């Protein structure tokens, strides 16, 4: 059995490699870092760690329950019959922290920069809109309930953002930021880029996500260095995209 713990929306790609019948999808709420071989720094305590696992066909199987037992040693773990909806919900959450990746800051530091929280919420609203248009049923992740999400309405992205920043811990650094620090290609093209790609197919404008992808490309190519001042480049890129 292959349990994909990646952030991006890629269970179908995993299925192409190892066979659909061998794949179990998973969603993760946990911050950790690996900068030295064999040493994992965990930034989220067990009480704030959450997983959801699900079969791609939506069935609740015995092997799924076995995986759940294993993951309960690490944190909370729920079973889901809506793994695609759950994965898109996590993609929404990840899309909102990806704007931090070029700032060389921890998540809590980045979100305090003037305008950054509102920008991230704008990213999330686009991601929610595209997911809804694709027909995905949004899952109440991170300990939230269906009622929480439903009552929030258009402010659901803001609710998820606040909950996520609170739970992951003060030392959390977004996954894409770690990739940039290591000089690796980040997952942003498969997260925000996925939102942009699906948005274009559906005729939905996604300037916030588009801006995040563009800044990530500039960072990876070396056109800009990791620095908090990149927030100004990000905001300027958004203005250009909206104007165009």
Report each predicted region and the residues it spans.
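Rossmann-fold dinucleotide-binding core
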Residues: 5-96, 101
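NAD(P)-dependent Rossmann-like dehydrogenase/reductase catalytic/cofactor-binding core
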Residues: 121-244
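Short, solvent-exposed coil/turn linker segments
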Residues: 19, 82, 97-99, 106-109, ...
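Beta-strand-loop-alpha-helix segment that lines the small-molecule cofactor/substrate pocket
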Residues: 1
């Amino acid at each position: 059995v292959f349990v994909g713990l990646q952030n991006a929306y890629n269970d179908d790609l995993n299925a192409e490699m190892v066979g659909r019948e061998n794949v179990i999808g998973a969603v993760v709420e946990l911050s950790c870092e690996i900068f030295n071989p064999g040493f994992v720094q965990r930034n989220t305590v067990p009480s704030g760690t959450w997983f959801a696992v699900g079969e791609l066909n939506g069935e609740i199987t015995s092997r799924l329950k076995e995986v759940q037992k294993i993951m309960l040693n690490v944190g909370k773990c729920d079973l889901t019959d809506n793994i695609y909806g759950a994965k898109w919900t996590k993609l929404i959450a990840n899309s909102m922290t990806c704007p931090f990746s070029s700032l060389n800051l921890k998540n809590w530091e980045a979100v305090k920069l003037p305008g950054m929280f509102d920008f991230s919420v704008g990213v999330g609203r686009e991601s929610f809109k595209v997911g809804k248009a694709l027909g995905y049923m949004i899952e109440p992740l991170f300990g939230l309930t269906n009622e929480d999400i439903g009552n929030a309405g258009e402010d659901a992205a803001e609710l998820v953002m606040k909950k996520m920043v609170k739970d992951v811990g003060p030392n959390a650094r977004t996954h894409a930021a770690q990739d940039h620090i290591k000089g690796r290609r980040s997952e942003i093209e498969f997260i925000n880029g996925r939102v942009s790609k699906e948005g274009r197919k559906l005729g939905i404008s996604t300037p916030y996500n588009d801006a995040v992808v563009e800044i990530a490309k500039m960072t990876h190519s070396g056109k800009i260095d990791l620095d908090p001042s990149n927030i100004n480049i990000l905001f300027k890129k958004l203005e250009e995209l909206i104007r165009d």
